[in-house]
Design a protein with these regions (language model features):
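Active-site mouth loops of central-metabolism enzymes
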Residues: 11-23, 121-134, 274-282
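Short, solvent-exposed loop/turn and secondary-structure capping segments
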Residues: 18-20, 52, 88, 94-98, ...
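Carbohydrate-binding surfaces of carbohydrate-active enzymes
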Residues: 2-3, 31, 39, 66, ...
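N-terminal small/glycine-rich loop or linker at the start of catalytic domains
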Residues: 1-15, 110-122, 257-273
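Active-site-adjacent "subsite" loops/lids of carbohydrate-active enzymes
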Residues: 85-146, 179-184, 195-197
Length: 650
């Protein structure tokens, strides 16, 4: 079982600075204790290419005079802290400079490669060269010498490469280097070879060591990669470019994978990795770790040890402020499974394209609406969910289309948007509507047939629209076109032409258990964020789910609501989170002051009357009413994170 309070201790250290001079086992242990840390990832080899222990395979850091890795492992063992070992896989700057034939060549353009080689950063090596054997030898050396509890391999991904070896091997296989599909296929073959070789290097010496290959993102639907790991670590530093909504999206997918244990990896830095002297406010770290545990994950906090190798006391006092709270909450975390009403069939998993924005927009709408949801791929059992969302894109396999049809035929509720229900030029589910093709106008306008914040007027929709004609059901939105598309020949004002009110078409329909929205609202929401996109989706959800929604909590849009089940303890845990973020500097979203919420009204659908409802870990009872299969209660205060236990008699 993964531990919940981990630190990822980066140690990428130049050969031009002293290393290890200040290391003290006692100081190292004292800081880990102050941080309430129960697992720390320590370094065998860094991105610079140096080892931090005696080695016959690689080269020890030229300024290191003792076995630093061995000393760290011993220190951790004495205090019961686990210590997986880190080995940089994709980067090895020392070998990149020494071995040109091992270099990853991202382009056949020699000038582009020369410019890349001069850039001041780490450079990538190719796994289709002798470097892979070199890497595996390093892994085996660590396994034999230290028998660690786990191996963490970093900077890995399928890559197209134009190095001499890759070009030669592609030709030998009859693949065309000029063909993009062939290049990507060969890149995946090389990546698969890397996964197999490195895993074998671990498994030759241990059946129990954990293995994780880090690429900074968990690719949805890619089981060749997912299954190569014993667990998953979701690298997601909100201030490091990932943002505060990346982790909930990634977690909502990963927690659906059978038997998958996972961590949410944030950092103590103000910005991101490698920032010596950068600290976020304790409230930010408290929120980020609470977000991890509320989404079913353990926690991992990134730090970077000073080259002199003494841990920074301020850092571990900061970490301790967050992890002391996580430690108190652990009895309500182990074995907890997230409950979800809604499944989103991930656009990334369907298309294989990480850059599609539909998942991002859907995640934001669901998060802001405080709905219980998961992201799933085509392998999921849709029948577990009350509502299936099909966002914007249509690239489903025949098997997936049949599963969606079966789900609908059995009464499953569906909301589909944009192209999601279209296959071979028509809707693949009969919901009383006929597909009429892609609208030639963009943007278009949406006019609601229901109450909205700004009333019954025309709202611009900066996205594509599919025309359709429904003969059954409730039309809950209509569509209007602009007078014309903006071109050099004709344009109007600064942005786009106004709506033409003389013509109005069907825009969204609900018929029975199926809702269809003609616009790509999720992609548009991720890009533009118009409130009307969310209002359109929210109306459809509430119309279809009604009183079946498991949790309703009156929270601001930045609030987060999750709900978990501990079967063994016969209880559910309601997680309520709220933090106010603000932008500091250039696009750095930070959390500083807490803004408590008071008297938060909650309504939870229950199979039977709870025996008690309690604030935990404080063990403060809450009064509640049980009406129409719903427990109604008020949470007096939410200050960053609040957990509510809903318990039942056995």
């Amino acid at each position: 079982m993964l531990r919940k309070r981990q630190v990822h201790l980066d140690f990428h250290t130049s050969e031009y600075v002293p290393v290890g001079d200040n290391f003290s086992k006692e100081q190292f242990q004292a800081c880990l204790k102050a941080g309430h840390v129960d697992s720390v990832t320590v370094f065998s080899k860094c991105h610079h290419g140096w080892s931090y222990h005696p080695t016959k395979v690689n080269e020890i850091h030229p300024q290191l005079k003792f076995d630093l890795l061995g000393a760290q492992l011993e220190a951790c063992k004495e205090i019961g802290v686990k210590a997986p070992v880190y080995i940089s896989a994709g980067y090895d700057e020392k070998e990149y400079l020494k071995r040109p034939e091992w270099r990853w060549c991202f382009s056949p353009d020699k000038k582009a490669m020369e410019e890349y080689e001069k850039e001041v950063h780490f450079h990538t090596l190719c796994f289709n060269t002798g470097y892979l054997d070199f890497l595996c030898a390093q892994i085996e050396e660590v396994m034999v010498k230290y028998n660690p509890c786990g191996i963490f391999l970093d900077i890995i991904a399928p890559r197209v490469c134009y190095c001499e070896k890759c070009v030669s091997d592609m030709k030998a296989l009859g693949l065309d280097i000029e063909n993009e599909a062939d290049r990507e296929s060969f890149g995946q073959m090389v990546f698969n070879k890397y996964l197999e070789a490195t895993n074998n290097a671990v498994r030759k010496h241990s059946d129990t060591a954990t293995i994780f290959h880090n690429s900074g993102h968990i690719p949805k639907g890619d089981y060749r990669y997912i299954d190569a790991n014993t667990h998953l670590e979701l690298e997601s530093l909100p201030t490091g470019g990932w943002g505060y909504d990346h982790f909930p999206l990634s977690a909502a997918y990963v927690r659906t994978i059978k038997d998958a244990e996972f961590l949410g990896m944030t950092g103590k830095f103000h910005h991101s990795w490698g920032e010596f002297g950068g600290y976020k406010h304790p409230n930010a770290l408290i929120y980020e770790t609470a977000l991890s545990i509320a989404n079913g994950a353990g926690c991992s906090i990134g730090d970077q040890m000073h080259p002199l190798s003494d841990l920074n006391k301020a850092t571990y006092n900061l970490i301790g402020k967050a992890y002391s709270l996580v430690e108190e909450k652990e009895p309500w975390l182990f074995g907890a499974v997230n409950v979800a009403d809604i499944a989103v069939l991930s656009a990334e998993s369907t298309t294989g394209d990480r850059s599609v924005k539909a998942d991002v927009g859907a995640n934001r709408m669901l998060l802001e609406n405080h709905m219980l949801y998961n992201f799933v791929d085509e392998n999921a059992d849709f029948s577990q969910y009350k509502l299936l969302v099909l966002p914007d894109v249509s690239a489903y396999s025949t098997e997936a289309i049949n599963k969606i049809k079966e789900y609908a035929e059995n009464g499953g509720k569906i909301i589909a948007t944009g192209d999601a229900l279209i296959n071979e030029g028509k809707f693949f589910i009969d919901f009383g509507a006929e597909y009429k093709g892609k609208n030639e106008f963009e943007p278009t306008y949406f006019k609601p047939c229901f109450e909205t914040v700004n009333g019954n007027t025309e709202y611009v929709m900066r996205c594509s629209f599919n025309k359709f004609e429904a003969t059954e059901g409730e039309i809950f939105a209509t569509e209007q076109n602009p007078y014309f598309n903006r071109t050099l020949e004709h344009f109007c004002s600064h942005m786009h032409a106004p709506n033409n009110p003389q013509e109005e078409f069907q825009g969204a329909v609900i018929n029975g258990n199926i809702a269809y929205i003609g616009w790509d609202i999720f992609t548009a929401y991720a890009t533009h964020g118009h409130l009307c996109f969310k209002e359109l989706f929210t109306y459809a959800v509430k119309k279809l789910l009604g009183n079946e929604q498991t949790v309703i909590a009156e929270m601001p849009d930045r609030g987060v609501v999750t709900y978990t089940r501990q079967q063994k303890e016969n209880r559910n845990i309601l997680h309520l989170l709220f933090a106010h973020t603000t932008v500091r500097g250039t696009n750095t979203e930070v959390i500083e002051d807490t803004v408590p919420l008071y008297n938060v009204k909650c309504s939870v659908r229950c199979d039977k009357r709870p025996s008690k409802i309690t604030l935990v870990p404080e063990n403060t009872s809450l009064e509640f009413e049980f009406v129409d299969d719903r427990a109604e209660f008020i949470v007096p205060k939410v200050d960053i994170h609040r957990m509510v236990e809903i318990a039942y008699e056995n």
